[in-house]
C-alpha cells in the first residue's frame, strides 16, 4: 500500500500545484487593461442619477429576460452533435472590396460597412467611425471568437483622422482594446453610452474628449470652429464657421445588456441617430425587437438609411438580438428608405449558419417599403440617391463550396 501511496501523493501534489499555477495566472491576467475599468467618481454619480439605472444596474425599458429557454449550453451542443451541425463559419474567404478610405471625397456622404457592427461614415464633411474592430478576434482571449477568413481588411493605419468615434456599448465585439489604443492619435471626439468612457479613459483617452450619453440625450457637432456640445450643456456657443452643417448624434434605447467581466450592465448600451440638415441615419446597436423602433421612427424618422442587428440570434436569448424577420419589421417601423443588415459577416457568436441572416432577410424584404442594400465589406454605399446595385455576394461563397464538392466526385 505504501508503494501505491507515494505515487498518488506525488500526483495529488502536482495536481494541486498545477491548479494553483493556473489560478495565479488567471488572477494575474485578470489585471490586464483589456477588461477595462468600472465607472467611478463623477461618472458613477451621473450613472446612479440616471432613470435607467435601477438597483445597481442599468435596465431595459421593458421586461427583457437574459435567457428565454431552460436549455443549457451543454444540451444545445449535444443536440447539434446528434443532428445536422450549423455551418457557423464560411468555407471560403469572404469577398471584400478594400476601398482606400484616405482617398475618398469628403464631400460625398457615404457609409462603408467594415464587417459585423463596424462602420466608417462620411456625413456633412465629417469622418465618423462606429464600433471599430481592427483585430482578428473579439474577446479577451485570442483563440475565442475569431474573425472569418478574408474579413481582416483594415487596420487603424488605413484610416484617415476621425472627427467622431462612436462606441455603442462595451461588449468585446464592439469595443476592442487593441483597436482603441491604435486609434487614439487619430480621434478628435468620442461619443459613447453612459459609463463606457471609464474604459476609454483607462486606455489613455483624455477625459475632455469623451462624451457619454444617456438614452434620449443629444451630442451636437456644430458648424463652427468650437466643435461640439452636449445636450447637458445647452449654453450658446459661437465661433468661426467651418462651412460644415451641424451634426446631431442622438442616443436611442435598445434591448440588450453590457459588461466586459462577470458583473453585467454597469454601463449603458445604445443605438444612435446621425442627423444633419440633409440626412438621417440610424444604427441600432445590439438589440432585440421592441416598441422602441416605432417610437424612434415617429420621433426622428423617416431615415435615409438604417443598419439593424440582424444576426447572432438564438432561441436561448430571443430578446437580446433580432431574428431577420424582426429586423425587417423594425426597418418599416423606423420608416427607413434603405436598410443594411448588421451584426453579421465577421464573427460567430450564435449557432446559426453564417449566411442564414442574409438569406432570411432577403426573402423577408420582398415587397417591403424600403430598399435592401447588402454591400460587401469595404464597399461604399452612397447616400445621395444614386442608383446602386448590390448582389447577393454570400451566394458566391456557397457556390465555391458546391463546385469544390463536385470536383471531388
Language-model segment annotations:
Residues 50, 143-194, 211, 301-307:
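Active-site metal-binding motif and surrounding structural segment of the metallo-beta-lactamase
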Residues 176-185, 349-359, 385:
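Metal-dependent catalytic neighborhoods of phosphoester/phosphodiester hydrolases
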Residues 118-122, 243-302, 318, 322-326:
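Catalytic core of the metallo-beta-lactamase
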Residues 134-151, 257-263, 314-320:
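Acidic/histidine-rich helix-loop elements
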Residues 121, 131, 169, 176, ...:
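Divalent metal-coordination and catalytic microenvironments
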Residues 2-145, 152-155, 193-283, 304-310, 360-378, 384, ...:
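Metallo-beta-lactamase
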Residues 2, 9-10, 19, 24-42, ...:
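Cap/insert and terminal regions of metallo-dependent hydrolase folds
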Amino acid at each position: 500500500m505504501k508503494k501505491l501511496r507515494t505515487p498518488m501523493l506525488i500526483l495529488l501534489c502536482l495536481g494541486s500545484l498545477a491548479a494553483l499555477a493556473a489560478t495565479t495566472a488567471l488572477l494575474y491576467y485578470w489585471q490586464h487593461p483589456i477588461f477595462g475599468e468600472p465607472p467611478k467618481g463623477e461618472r458613477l454619480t451621473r450613472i446612479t442619477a440616471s432613470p435607467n439605472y435601477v438597483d445597481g444596474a442599468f435596465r431595459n425599458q421593458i421586461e427583457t429576460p437574459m435567457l428565454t429557454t431552460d436549455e443549457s449550453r451543454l444540451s444545445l451542443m449535444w443536440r447539434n452533435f446528434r443532428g445536422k451541425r450549423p455551418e457557423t463559419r464560411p468555407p471560403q474567404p469572404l469577398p471584400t472590396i478594400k476601398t482606400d478610405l484616405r482617398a475618398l471625397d469628403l464631400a460625398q456622404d457615404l457609409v462603408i460597412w467594415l464587417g459585423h457592427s463596424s462602420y466608417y461614415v462620411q456625413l456633412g464633411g465629417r469622418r465618423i467611425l462606429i464600433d471599430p474592430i481592427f483585430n482578428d478576434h473579439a474577446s479577451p482571449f485570442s483563440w475565442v471568437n475569431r474573425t472569418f477568413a478574408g474579413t481582416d481588411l483594415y487596420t487603424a493605419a488605413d484610416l484617415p483622422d476621425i472627427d467622431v468615434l462612436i462606441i455603442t456599448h462595451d461588449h468585446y465585439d464592439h469595443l476592442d482594446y487593441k483597436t482603441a489604443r491604435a486609434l487614439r492619435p487619430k480621434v478628435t471626439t468620442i461619443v459613447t453610452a453612459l459609463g463606457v468612457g471609464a474604459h476609454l479613459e483607462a486606455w489613455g483617452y483624455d477625459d475632455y474628449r469623451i462624451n457619454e450619453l444617456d438614452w434620449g440625450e443629444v451630442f451636437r457637432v456644430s458648424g463652427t470652429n468650437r466643435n461640439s456640445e452636449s445636450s447637458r450643456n445647452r449654453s450658446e456657443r459661437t465661433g468661426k464657421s467651418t462651412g460644415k452643417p451641424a451634426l446631431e448624434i442622438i442616443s436611442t434605447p435598445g434591448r440588450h445588456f453590457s459588461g466586459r467581466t462577470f458583473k453585467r450592465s454597469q454601463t449603458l448600451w445604445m443605438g444612435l441617430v446621425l442627423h444633419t440638415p440633409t440626412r438621417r441615419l440610424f444604427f441600432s446597436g445590439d438589440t432585440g425587437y421592441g416598441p422602441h423602433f416605432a417610437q424612434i421612427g415617429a420621433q426622428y424618422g423617416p431615415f435615409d438609411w438604417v443598419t439593424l442587428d440582424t444576426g447572432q440570434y438564438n432561441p436561448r436569448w430571443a430578446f437580446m438580438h433580432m431574428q431577420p424577420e424582426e429586423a425587417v419589421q423594425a426597418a418599416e417601423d423606423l420608416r427607413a428608405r434603405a436598410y443594411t443588415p448588421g451584426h453579421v459577416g465577421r464573427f460567430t457568436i450564435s449557432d446559426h449558419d453564417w449566411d442564414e441572416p442574409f438569406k432570411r432577410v432577403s426573402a423577408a424584404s420582398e415587397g417591403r417599403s424600403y430598399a435592401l442594400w447588402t454591400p460587401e465589406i469595404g464597399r461604399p454605399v452612397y447616400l445621395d440617391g444614386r442608383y446602386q446595385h448590390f448582389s447577393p455576394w454570400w451566394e458566391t461563397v456557397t457556390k465555391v463550396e458546391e463546385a469544390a464538392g463536385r470536383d471531388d466526385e
